[in-house]
């Protein structure tokens, strides 16, 4: 009775049902919005298709019932009372549906150089909402003929139709999380990013970086030292310039605010804002406007390449000497995701690295790519080839009977050249360990091919996002942190930066992190020689690597 009254009083007056026919063409279905679809039968037996949009600002999606802690979704309520809406028809079948539309737009191919690039991207985002459907989801089983009719209207192949059991959009959970707090077992234990033991509180950041390279590990350690780094740079009279790449930033970003402060304080501020960061385009367009209005020089990347690197360079002039402070990260400059994703942030006053970072920014300013650096690995022209060269070094060592090793931590591995070279390394006897969360196009453990390769994936509370490359052992060992996965889109079609870690303590820290991830027996899955992933069994003490890293960060602060 309560639901019926709610439907009749709150929902029925504002919904807009449509019956598809000669005068009512099949409506445009918006991307990721929910619709109720119904097969109607007239008294003469003729069938028609009815559609009701279920996303409406006129009513709440989550309907709270009188019984405490009980809810119903508005779309399910609409579906239930569809006979009341189409009362002149018999209801033959009904379902909730959702269409996913293509989000890929080739901005470079469509761009007209006579147009302002930012305005062009803003217009392109509007166009994306009308791209072709790539998926149709249904919550109820429907007759094949009806599904075919929907596919015809949407110009979609039936292979891309999926029936799902769960609600089509789970975002309603955020609305009830405060109520659910009364049931603590439904939630993770609270984890607060800890202070980094590598930085001394209350002291300027720059002298500490000059004294020794630093490494922050998110989300176990706080992003605050990096924020302090930017804040100090914005206000330090000796700072000449700040240069930075931005790919995805928070909607309320202290990082961007500090860049604005720096420009207003008379610093030279160069910011590369990647307007092609998918689904962040609108946010980036808005920030680019604010940065430009504050006096920052804003550039938008390269024709044909996305700039995905996480690079920041602060240049100081102290007592007539130029100093370079470089920060290189594996993840975005985003305060929100720094609490949710595992990432690394490396800071150094190494002059040679600083000069190469300056070379990267100079190339980006001139719409060019870097092709000659000694320390950094910079895609698209000198990351893949240097990685292949380092794998070759391990192959040569293995053939000479020496210990050879490769350790890789990343999100995905799809680059065929690198995969082929890793297979060659395995065949030569190089031991290879890989922690790859997502796509891995290399199958390990195949006799005569990849028997020396071990692949595991860790999916835990935090999204594994850091990239670590390890080549060699002992005095030959090279360790890098990077923004790039080994996918051709990263190695050949993006500007990416990998940084060498020379500090012995930081190298050891990264090695220990990698070994811990290889020992995870709670959230890890091991890939077998058939490409299947199996749970890594806990043979000894249970080890959740993410929990371990947090406990380590907490212990370092409290000791």
Name each model feature, range by range.
Residues 1-406, 424, 428, 440-464, ...:
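N-terminal localization/anchoring segments of enzymes in phospholipid and broader phosphate metabolism
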Residues 431-435:
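Hydrophobic alpha/beta core scaffold segments
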